[in-house]
């Protein structure tokens, strides 16, 4: 930074020939120097270009304005980095920086040539880029034309001309490609170049397929990216995330290939099995028909087709596959389904099928086809693929994209910090120039009394050096004048203005939390708490949550944009408390660098007297938007002269805009202020003006530049929008204000909103006229109410104030629209205006925090997503145009291939709109069906390429980036810190008032009753009197909410009396977080102890709020209820503390009844010391022991499992299986008795109190009740009653009892229960959000989905045949096959609308709804094809907002909840520093390993050679390559290959079998019996044996078992082994590691999901077993048996195909179904469904499984992925330790865990980095000071520990963790102690170590002596003798010091590198002493 020229106007210098000469001179100097300094450069990084002065950025504002003559002129480069590079810059009017190369462009135009200068001027002009932008947009519009008229050709030439002109200008200005900053050096220009070249090519050269080349023109749309500034960065981020995705992509492709191979082997040719007619004519055979048939069409008559399906019915040859109907048999013939594109016949198609499975697009169809053709057992294949492939891989992509985004974000934050620093440095430079002035100011201040006054300490800039302001002094004077006038006029207006600007006293009180009523008192209190702090540091103690935020002049520039978004929807009057340092309107934007405490005004150290001590400026914004900087509150002087601030927590915000007099008076009343006469003191005035004013002016200028409107607008507003005409009016206004602002009015309005919403939701089709009228009147009434509210508010607040509040603007808009709609009600086609009424629903957000938060999150994300949305729009546009250009013609020409009527289908690419819809559909994840059409009409390759690109770029990358952004705006702060507005508080105040009123009425009633019915007891008077004062206080507290107390000053004034409460209040008010948490839950009254884990007031000190005894009692109660007695395995729920003290006698039961019961009914008290009581107590103790026994629990679990299993047998075939039915009936009774017995035992053992306070016990109790009731009913013979039957279905809940018994599931359930409140919240918000769309749908489509159909083939009559309902009914009378039919899922009322929307949001069944909507004409009119085409837009908007945002909110909420619960459970991680974590993790890995005994090398020479070969790494890799080759040959296989090919593949396979057998044999020879000690070897052996057997018995095995080729596929798993050897595969290893880490959690979630599926399957069987077979329900997929139900439910788990299963259940009456239909073998009649049950069943299942469980799965993966990436970035990974031990095995073949010292050097050199210590390494190793044992041996852990320490570096953290580590090792590796050969005593060890040290010392000493002797220098003997003992003493001292057990080694870390002994000894010795003690004990015992 030091190199930067001083910023300001004079830093701009024209670029002249001298400048160029100077640069050349510098370059030559550098070159001369360069030869000398070449070496230096390698080590040090050179200077970097300044990030603020990059080309394309705005000029930093510190440089001020550009002097007039310098705009668009070449200037010398400002960036010192380019001082020796040939560059210059040009600045345009907008201060954008353009950097050019100073070498001649095109070798002839120097920077000074007029042509180049003109080109530069044109290039940098803003109009130039505008022109290009407009051209591109116009061009895009022309590109969307599907059949352009002829004249467009000329337009095309114009475009090309403009682009050519643009490129020419750029080339002339910049040069072509030689040197930096030339035309082709910018990749975006390549795009232009390519576009222009292609434009000329297509024009002048005839290249055949022009349309393909024309599509290149689409790339012009990409140019928008290069023109709009923000887009480049987003595209950068996208490209970054695509790079990051490479690993995931490789892994995905690999996994899909493996699965595709398995699919190929399992299902090859299966999808061609079709049902073929048996009754053929005589000369026809299957072969002859197949050979003669020209096309599929001819074969159609031989195959069996289901109604409405395009493909023939599939069937299979196995028993559990699909069967053919009568008269048909199963054959393999014809083509595959879906135009032949769905199959597993070749590797390619199988891969496509699996990619489709992974993206879950229409996969239910593939699933059903495959299961029908191959058999139901293959469901397992799909389960694995969906869970591993789909959920895991897709979410990994999400995780990676999210991480890339997160990193990008972090980088941006870092950059911002960096800039802040740079600006600070610039400021410091400015300040240095002012120091003299400062000194004068300080001197002048000394004679002014401090207590009375202080001047603004703002001295950022002085008049001499203010480069920040380049405006004239005259302007400044004018502004000052205006300001004075304004202030004085403000004072004249006086009282009039009071009300107008800020409302009543009360509202002001609400707005400014002013706790400093007794300033001195508070100050003294604070002083006591912080006696040693300097005056300036006090602020830190007061505002502990917020470190002092530096007010940087520049901060508004960087963060200005974000400010709006945060409070966009918050009520502006009451923006967030934390930002009370003024918001929006003010210049000083609080920026909080977390760790930095610096005083606000940087000259603090120099002039303390002039400072506002609390380091805070009060900047109020007056009505003009001008910031008046008012000083902070005055300092209070304490007797010792220390300054203390008074605490003002106030807020200046944009809407109570202004330094209104009242506000100022309010402040003056409580704090000393700059008095008027002081300002008149000439000296002071001058000083204040000269210093502060200049800056203030600059500040004002900046402020003005940020004002939303020009100054004249403010003048106008003041004149016309503030109504203060007469005193009567003002009184009236006050009265109105009092009414309108009352909380009750708010409550009333909220109730009106809810009612209005209800009225709107009551619309339906068909409605009676009376009902219509009621709704119409209701609408009028509500419109009236809302209009009245608006008018009254306008009167009360004045338009100026009214329109400053976001909500008011919103209200006024809606009211206006409602009124407009009333007048235009009869105008046809304006019914859409009605939907604007729906927006009223959003007014609820005011008082509903979560809705507010959701809107805010959407608002913020849309803001943040602005650029991304643009990019997405550009991508969609480009692909839509590409599709149209490439495939449009083909759709038209080949339409007959895909549509029998040769009409264009709904999804085509013939025009832009339809093309856009297809691309949008692909983005929604639905690509496969439209792609089949495309491939059929336009050829496979192009379609595949385009679709895959849209899928990967659009869906996987961009949409995941969307999601990542959503998740990031979902940080827990958003969820917990929802800023609430006063209105929210108003509601709560109103509710609190009502509660108080009710309490008051209750109280008076109670007192009245007591008075009238009871005589006063003696002494009551006295007690009452003494209790009274407290009582009053307590009532006050308990009946009011904290929020109110905080607002009630009178209460606070009594603070001395209730110090306990108010001190806690003070605390909470001092801390921002606490304040926030207050607001969240204002309904909590103070005296209630808050249960942990549920409170929002986490940060508040609950102990202070509740009395101690109270909290102790509650703790005790909690502990008792939390641990469940219903199962012995149960632990307390997460978040609850463990009991502090165990009950005294753990094996005794607790009391039966609660204390309350015993008090009321004394008979419940039993004396247990005598008589019957004692017997009873013994019985209870016995029961208690039985129940607590572990076997009892196991038995109950077994019973639960058996009884649940029994339910699975009760399917529709139970009537036919009499024996099973009888067994089940008895079993049912037995289970019921057992469970009743269990319940009774528990009642006796635990007592009712314990039993019924446990949730799990309640569950058991209810389920037992159900069984009991059904049992009794059966006995009495009422089993066929309806209610009893439905009760029986509740038995399906039995498996729920298993929940509390299985640890893993309970963990998940607890996590879920924790998340339920927030999930419900989001669900509610979603419902509100959807309600709007639903009501809108009802308005648009109610009653329009009816159509007249021909019932024989289900086709719709055309409009020419039937135009409307009446015609249809007329036709019905003629023919019986006609029906006027409604779509089952429609918008006839809001409920059905919700169902439709759910189908659209899950993309299942949405096509039918959309088609019906698009075809709809009018109520009772016959639909017309695509009549209402633009209704598609309704669905597009809903999908974006309803589906995209709201459904992903679920993921957000769940992930967020996981994190919060982790915090609550608080593992050790939270308390560890980063450094500690590193060590901890390394040690964790270290501790888990120990050296293995390697397989010994055989003695035999021959075997030895083979052993060397087999154990070589190269051998492993060779085998891996062979495995991969084997896979490739398997991929080549395909269905129906030629005999020759089969023959070749057979022999290739034989070769591979021989090779693998060879490997097996070689290993067996060399490894002998050790071969079977390795798991992989056993696996290989099995595969080889199976392959050999398979070769000979292939036919037989395939018949009875699975095809043996499958095992070869499993071999692929061995590839996992080479990943470790490939250094580049680190990313993939991380991903697999993440999977391994998440497996346990995923298993638990899987279990829970299975349980849910099980219960739903039982329910489904009992409710839907007999529904009509249509849509998704058929002979294979139904609810008839348990297995079938599970198959159906598995597919709905991903929400696939639930619409098909629901459709038949919605049939409720004829003619849809037949209620009298007889089912043979069963007593059930009819095949109608129960719509309400069906809808509830499927919707609840989807919410539970799809939204909750599956999202938990996602949460776990995201979590583990981030953990795994952290692990992979750590310096030492698992692999490094593995590698250490692998090398170790070679040096320690017997696994003694020791190594000789002499081998150590070789060993260290043999390791891989990072542990490697290359030779020469002796010195380093000796320096490590490794402890040795006898025989000069060193233990492996000692070495590993030392090496690890070397990698991680020395640090203090090591010491803090040292003892833990040692214990860990000892427990993980007990062998360490047992292998220690020195087992005698501690002393022995010390001597041993000492001996080695002495030897070393002695050798050294001898060596020195020899040297001395040789050099023949004479030394006296005595000297030498004296020398030795000293040395010895020192050595011994050293040793003792190191190893004495008493001495702690706390100091070790402070002395530079601690010796290893000092790190590890004490613990080791501990273990040794333990060991010796143990041995002594053993000896003693043996003696005995």
Curated annotation (Swiss-Prot):
Residues 1887-1916 form the IQ domain. It catalyses: Na(+)(in) = Na(+)(out). The chain crosses the membrane at residues 126-145, 151-172, 186-204, 211-227, 242-267, 377-402, 745-761, 771-795, 805-821, 831-847, 865-887, 940-966, 1186-1210, 1223-1248, 1251-1276, 1286-1302, 1316-1340, 1430-1455, 1513-1532, 1544-1565, 1575-1596, 1606-1625, 1639-1661, 1732-1757. Residues 402-449, 684-708 form a coiled coil. Residues 1946-1958 have a biased composition (Polar residues). Expressed strongly in sciatic nerves, with moderate levels in kidney. Not detected in liver, brain and muscle. I repeats lie at residues 112-410. It is found in: Cell membrane; Cell projection, Neuron projection; Cell projection, Axon. Residues 26-55, 458-540, 574-609, 1015-1039, 1089-1145, 1933-1984 are annotated as: Disordered. Ubiquitinated by NEDD4L; which may promote its endocytosis. Phosphorylation at Ser-1488 by PKC in a highly conserved cytoplasmic loop increases peak sodium currents. III repeats lie at residues 1178-1486. Residues 146-150, 205-210, 268-346, 364-376, 762-770, 822-830, 888-914, 928-939, 1211-1222, 1277-1285, 1341-1392, 1404-1429, 1533-1543, 1597-1605, 1662-1684, 1698-1731 are extracellular. Residues 1135-1145 have a biased composition (Acidic residues). Residues 347-363, 915-927, 1393-1403, 1685-1697 dip into the membrane without crossing it. GO terms for cellular component: axon terminus; node of Ranvier; plasma membrane; voltage-gated sodium channel complex. Pore-forming subunit of Nav1.7, a voltage-gated sodium (Nav) channel that directly mediates the depolarizing phase of action potentials in excitable membranes. Navs, also called VGSCs (voltage-gated sodium channels) or VDSCs (voltage-dependent sodium channels), operate by switching between closed and open conformations depending on the voltage difference across the membrane. In the open conformation they allow Na(+) ions to selectively pass through the pore, along their electrochemical gradient. The sequence contains 4 internal repeats, each with 5 hydrophobic segments (S1, S2, S3, S5, S6) and one positively charged segment (S4). Segments S4 are probably the voltage-sensors and are characterized by a series of positively charged amino acids at every third position. This is Sodium channel protein type 9 subunit alpha. The gene is Scn9a.
């Amino acid at each position: 930074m030091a190199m930067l020229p001083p910023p300001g106007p004079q830093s701009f210098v024209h670029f002249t020939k001298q400048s160029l000469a100077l640069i050349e001179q510098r370059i030559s100097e550098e070159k001369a120097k360069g030869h000398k300094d070449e070496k230096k450069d390698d080590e040090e990084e050179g200077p970097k270009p300044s990030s603020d002065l990059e080309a394309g950025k705005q000029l930093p504002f510190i440089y001020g304005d550009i002097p007039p003559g310098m705009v668009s002129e070449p200037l010398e480069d400002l960036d010192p980095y380019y001082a020796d590079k040939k560059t210059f810059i040009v600045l345009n009017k907008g201060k954008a920086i353009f950097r050019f190369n100073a070498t001649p462009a095109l070798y002839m135009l120097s920077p000074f040539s007029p042509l180049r200068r003109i080109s530069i001027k044109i290039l940098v002009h803003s109009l130039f880029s505008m022109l290009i932008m407009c051209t591109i947009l116009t061009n895009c519009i022309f590109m969307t034309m599907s059949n352009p008229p002829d004249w467009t050709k000329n337009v095309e030439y114009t475009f090309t001309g403009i682009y050519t002109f643009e490129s020419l200008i750029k080339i002339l200005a910049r040069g072509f490609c030689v040197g930096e900053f030339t035309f082709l050096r910018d990749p975006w220009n390549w795009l232009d170049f390519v576009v222009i070249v292609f434009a000329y090519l297509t024009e002048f050269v005839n290249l055949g397929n022009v349309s393909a080349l024309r599509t290149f023109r689409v790339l012009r749309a990409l140019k928008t990216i290069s023109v709009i500034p923000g887009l480049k960065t987003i595209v950068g981020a996208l490209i970054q995330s695509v790079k990051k995705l490479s690993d995931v992509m490789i892994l995905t492709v690999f996994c899909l290939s493996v699965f595709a191979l398995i699919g190929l082997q399992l299902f090859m040719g299966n999808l061609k099995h079709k049902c073929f007619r048996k009754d053929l004519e005589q000369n026809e055979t299957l072969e002859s028909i197949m050979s003669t048939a020209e096309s599929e069409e001819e074969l159609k008559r031989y195959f069996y087709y289901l109604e409405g399906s395009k493909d023939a019915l599939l069937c299979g040859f196995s028993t559990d596959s699909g069967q053919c109907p009568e008269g048909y048999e199963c054959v393999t013939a014809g083509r595959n389904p879906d135009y032949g594109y769905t199959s597993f016949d070749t590797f390619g198609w199988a891969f496509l099928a699996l990619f489709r499975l992974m993206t879950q697009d229409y996969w239910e169809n593939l699933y059903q086809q495959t299961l029908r053709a191959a058999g139901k057992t293959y469901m397992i294949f799909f389960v694995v693929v969906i869970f591993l492939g789909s959920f895991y891989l897709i979410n990994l992509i999400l995780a990676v994209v999210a991480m890339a985004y997160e990193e990008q974000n972090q980088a941006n934050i870092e950059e911002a910090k960096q800039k802040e620093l740079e600006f600070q440095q610039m400021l410091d430079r400015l300040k240095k120039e002012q120091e003299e002035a400062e000194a004068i100011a300080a001197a002048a201040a000394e004679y002014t009394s401090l207590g009375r006054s202080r001047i603004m300490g703002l001295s950022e800039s002085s008049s001499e050096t203010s480069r920040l302001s380049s405006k004239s002094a005259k302007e400044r004077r004018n502004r000052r004048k205006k300001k004075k006038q304004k202030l004085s006029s403000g004072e004249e207006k006086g009282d009039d203005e009071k009300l107008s600007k800020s409302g009543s006293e009360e509202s002001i009180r609400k707005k400014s939390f002013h706790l400093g009523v007794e300033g001195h008192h508070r100050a003294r209190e604070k002083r006591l708490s912080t006696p040693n702090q300097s005056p300036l540091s006090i602020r830190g103690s007061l505002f502990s949550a917020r470190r002092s935020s530096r007010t940087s002049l520049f901060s508004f520039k960087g963060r200005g944009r974000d400010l709006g978004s945060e409070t966009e929807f918050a009520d502006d009057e009451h923006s967030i408390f934390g930002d009370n340092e003024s918001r929006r309107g003010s210049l000083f934007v609080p920026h909080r660098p977390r760790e930095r405490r610096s005083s606000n005004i940087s000259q603090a150290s120099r002039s303390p007297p002039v400072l506002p001590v609390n380091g805070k400026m009060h900047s109020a914004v007056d009505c003009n938007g001008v910031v008046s900087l008012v000083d902070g509150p005055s300092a209070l002087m304490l007797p010792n002269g220390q300054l203390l601030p008074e605490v003002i927590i106030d807020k200046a915000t944009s809407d109570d805009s202004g330094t209104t007099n009242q506000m100022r008076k309010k402040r003056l009343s409580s704090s000393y202020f700059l008095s008027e006469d002081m300002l008149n003191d000439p000296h002071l005035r001058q000083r204040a003006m000269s210093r502060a004013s200049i800056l203030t002016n600059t500040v004002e200028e900046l402020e003005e530049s940020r004002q939303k409107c020009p100054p004249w607008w403010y003048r106008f507003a003041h004149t016309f929008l503030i109504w203060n005409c007469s005193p009567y009016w003002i009184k009236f206004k006050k009265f109105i204000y009092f009414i309108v602002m009352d909380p009750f009015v708010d409550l009333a309005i909220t109730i009106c909103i809810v009612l209005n919403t209800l009225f709107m939701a009551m619309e339906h089709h068909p409605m009676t006229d009376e009902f219509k009228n009621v709704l119409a009147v209701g609408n009028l009434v509500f419109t009236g109410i809302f209009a009245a509210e608006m008018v009254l508010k306008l009167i009360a607040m004045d338009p100026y104030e009214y329109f400053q509040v976001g909500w008011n603007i919103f209200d006024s808009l809606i009211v206006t629209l409602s009124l407009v709609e009333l007048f235009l009600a009869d105008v046809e086609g304006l019914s859409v205006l009605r939907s604007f009424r729906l927006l009223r629903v959003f007014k609820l957000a005011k008082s509903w925090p979560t809705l507010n938060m959701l809107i805010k999150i959407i608002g913020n994300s849309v803001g943040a997503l602005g650029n991304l949305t643009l990019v997405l729009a550009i991508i969609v546009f480009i692909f839509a145009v590409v599709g149209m250009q490439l495939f449009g013609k083909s759709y038209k020409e080949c339409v007959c291939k895909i549509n029998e009527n040769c009409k264009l289908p709904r999804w085509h690419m013939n025009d832009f709109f339809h093309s856009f819809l297809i691309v949008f559909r692909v983005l929604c994840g639905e690509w496969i069906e439209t792609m089949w059409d495309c491939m059929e009409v336009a050829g496979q390759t192009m379609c595949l390429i385009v679709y895959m690109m849209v899928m990967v770029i659009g869906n996987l990358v961009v949409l995941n980036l969307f999601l990542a952004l959503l998740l990031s705006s979902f940080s827990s702060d958003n969820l917990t810190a929802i800023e609430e507005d006063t209105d929210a508080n108003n509601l709560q105040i109103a509710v609190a008032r009502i509660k108080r009123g009710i309490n008051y009425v209750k109280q008076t009633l109670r007192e009245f009753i007591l008075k009238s019915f009871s005589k006063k007891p003696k002494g009551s008077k006295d007690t009452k009197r003494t209790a009274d004062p407290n009582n009053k206080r307590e009532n006050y507290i308990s009946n009011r909410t904290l929020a109110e107390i905080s607002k009630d000053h009178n209460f606070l004034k009594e603070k001395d009396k209730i110090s306990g409460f108010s001190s806690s209040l003070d605390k909470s008010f001092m801390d921002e977080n606490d304040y926030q948490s207050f607001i969240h839950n204002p309904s909590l009254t103070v005296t209630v102890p808050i249960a942990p884990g549920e409170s929002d007031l986490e940060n508040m000190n609950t102990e202070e709020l509740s009395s101690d005894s109270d909290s102790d009692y509650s703790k005790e109660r909690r502990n008792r209820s939390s641990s469940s007695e219903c199962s012995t395995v149960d632990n307390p729920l997460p978040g609850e503390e463990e009991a502090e003290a165990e009950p005294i006698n753990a094996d005794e039961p607790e009391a039966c009844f609660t204390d309350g019961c015993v008090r009321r009914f004394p008979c419940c008290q039993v004396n247990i010391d005598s008589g019957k009581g004692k017997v009873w107590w013994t019985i209870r103790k016995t029961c208690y022991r039985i129940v607590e026994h572990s076997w009892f629990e196991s038995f109950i679990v077994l019973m639960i499992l058996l009884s649940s299993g029994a339910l699975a047998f009760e399917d529709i075939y139970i009537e036919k299986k009499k024996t099973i039915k009888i067994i089940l009936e008895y079993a049912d009774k037995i289970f019921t008795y057992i469970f009743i017995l269990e319940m009774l035992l528990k009642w006796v053992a635990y007592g009712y109190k314990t039993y019924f306070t446990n949730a799990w016990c309640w569950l058991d109790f209810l389920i037992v009740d159900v069984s009991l009731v059904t049992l009794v009913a059966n006995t009495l013979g009422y089993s066929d009653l309806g209610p009893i039957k439905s009760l029986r279905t509740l038995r399906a809940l039995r498996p729920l009892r298993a929940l509390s018994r299985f640890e893993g599931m309970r963990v998940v359930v607890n996590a879920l229960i924790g998340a339920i409140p927030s999930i419900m919240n989001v669900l509610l918000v979603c419902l509100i959000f959807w309600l709007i769309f639903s009501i809108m749908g009802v308005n648009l489509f109610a009653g329009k989905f009816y159509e007249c159909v021909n019932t024989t083939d289900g086709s719709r009559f055309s409009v020419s045949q039937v135009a409307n309902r009446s015609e249809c009914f007329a036709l019905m009378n003629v023919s019986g096959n006609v029906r006027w039919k409604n779509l089952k899922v429609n918008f006839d009322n809001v409920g059905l609308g919700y169902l439709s929307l759910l189908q659209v949001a899950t993309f299942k069944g949405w096509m039918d709804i959309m088609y019906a909507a698009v075809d709809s004409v009018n109520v009772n009119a016959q639909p017309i094809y695509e009549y209402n085409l633009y209704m598609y837009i309704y669905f597009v908007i809903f999908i974006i907002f309803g589906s995209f945002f709201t459904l992903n909110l679920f993921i957000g909420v769940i992930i967020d909840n996981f994190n919060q619960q982790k915090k609550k459970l608080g593992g050790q991680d939270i308390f560890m520093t980063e450094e500690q974590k590193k060590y901890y993790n390394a040690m964790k890995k270290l501790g888990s390993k120990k050296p293995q005994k390697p397989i010994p090398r055989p003695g035999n020479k021959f075997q030895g050679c083979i052993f060397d070969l087999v154990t070589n790494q190269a051998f492993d890799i060779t085998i891996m390559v062979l495995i991969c080759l084997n896979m490739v040959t398997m991929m080549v296989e395909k269905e129906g290959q030629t005999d020759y090919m089969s023959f070749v593949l057979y022999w290739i396979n034989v070769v591979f079998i021989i090779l693998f057998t060879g490997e097996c044999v070689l290993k067996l020879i060399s490894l002998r019996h050790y071969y079977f000690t390795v798991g992989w070897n056993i696996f290989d052996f099995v595969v080889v044996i199976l392959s050999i057997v398979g070769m000979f018995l292939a036919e037989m095995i395939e018949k009875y078992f699975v095809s043996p080729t499958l095992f070869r596929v499993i071999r692929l798993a061995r590839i996992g082994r080479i990943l470790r050897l490939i250094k580049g595969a680190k990313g993939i290893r991380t991903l697999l590691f993440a999977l391994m880490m998440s497996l346990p959690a995923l298993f638990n979630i899987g279990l829970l999901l299975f349980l849910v599926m099980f219960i739903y399957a039982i329910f489904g069987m009992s409710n839907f077993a007999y529904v009509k077979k249509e849509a998704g329900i058929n002979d294979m997929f139904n609810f008839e048996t348990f297995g079938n139900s599970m198959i159906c439910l598995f597919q709905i788990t991903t929400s696939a195909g639930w619409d098909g299963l629901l459709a038949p259940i919605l049939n409720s009456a004829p003619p849809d179904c037949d209620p009298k239909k007889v089912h043979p073998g069963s007593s059930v009649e009819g095949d109608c469904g129960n719509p309400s049950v069906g809808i509830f069943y499927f919707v609840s299942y989807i919410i539970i499984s799809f939204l909750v469980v599956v999202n938990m799965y996602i949460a776990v993966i995201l979590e583990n992925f981030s953990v795994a990436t952290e692990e992979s970035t750590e310096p030492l990974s698992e692999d490094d330790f593995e590698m250490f031990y692998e090398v170790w095995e070679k040096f320690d073949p017997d696994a003694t865990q020791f190594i000789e010292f002499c081998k150590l050097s070789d060993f260290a050199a043999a390791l891989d980095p990072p542990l490697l210590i290359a030779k020469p390494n002796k010195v380093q190793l000796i320096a490590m000071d490794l402890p040795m044992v006898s025989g000069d041996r060193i233990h492996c852990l000692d070495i590993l520990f030392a090496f690890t320490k070397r990698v991680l570096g020395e640090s203090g953290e090591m010491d803090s963790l040292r003892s833990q580590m040692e214990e860990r090792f000892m427990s993980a590796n007990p062998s360490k102690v047992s292998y220690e050969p020195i087992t005698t005593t501690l002393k022995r060890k010390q001597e041993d170590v000492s001996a080695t040290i002495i030897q070393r010392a002695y050798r050294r000493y001898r060596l020195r002596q020899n040297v001395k002797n040789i050099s023949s220098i004479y030394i006296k003997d005595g000297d030498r003798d004296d020398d030795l003992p000293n040395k010895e003493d020192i050595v011994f001292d050293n040793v003792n010091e190191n190893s004495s057990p008493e001495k702690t080694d706390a100091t070790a870390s402070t002395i530079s590198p601690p010796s290893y002994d000092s790190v590890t000894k004490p613990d080791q010795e501990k273990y040794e002493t333990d060991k010796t003690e143990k041995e002594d004990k053993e000896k003693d015992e043996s003696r005995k």
